[in-house]
């Protein structure tokens, strides 16, 4: 991927959504909503404070994150759909068990 986010921007790849419910019902692609979880692929250097020092981001590359349904801007890079969003659009980091 040849995309480097600036400031507090984060590049996220949506994770595939389950196409089958717990009871075994298959959800067709046309009825499935876009997933609201993704994996962080790249992060920017962060915002700057009043003195010009960078403020580090709370997320890191590889984190699994939750975000709003309409968060971010969709871009296509190397045939892959990615989201570019601000860190503040990310609601939570999903911790692995």
UniProtKB/Swiss-Prot annotation:
PROSITE patterns assigned: CHAPERONINS_CPN10
**Assigned keywords, A-Z:** Chaperone, Cytoplasm
What are the subcellular locations of this protein? Cytoplasm
GO biological process annotation, one example: chaperone cofactor-dependent protein refolding
Assembly and interaction partners: Heptamer of 7 subunits arranged in a ring. Interacts with the chaperonin GroEL.
Name assigned to this protein: Co-chaperonin GroES
This protein's GO cellular component annotations are: cytoplasm
Report which superkingdom the organism of origin falls in: Bacteria
Annotated membrane-spanning segments are none
SMART domains the UniProt entry points to: Cpn10
Matching entries from SUPFAM superfamilies are given as: GroES-like
The free-text function statement in the UniProt record for this protein reads:
Together with the chaperonin GroEL, plays an essential role in assisting protein folding. The GroEL-GroES system forms a nano-cage that allows encapsulation of the non-native substrate proteins and provides a physical environment optimized to promote and accelerate protein folding. GroES binds to the apical surface of the GroEL ring, thereby capping the opening of the GroEL channel.
- Recall the GO molecular function terms of this protein's record: ATP binding; metal ion binding; protein folding chaperone; protein-folding chaperone binding; unfolded protein binding
Name its species. Answer: Burkholderia cepacia
The protein's matches in Gene3D superfamilies, at most eight in alphabetical order, are given as: GroES chaperonin (2.30.33.40)
- A Pfam family that this protein carries is Cpn10
Q: What family does the database annotate? A: Belongs to the GroES chaperonin family.
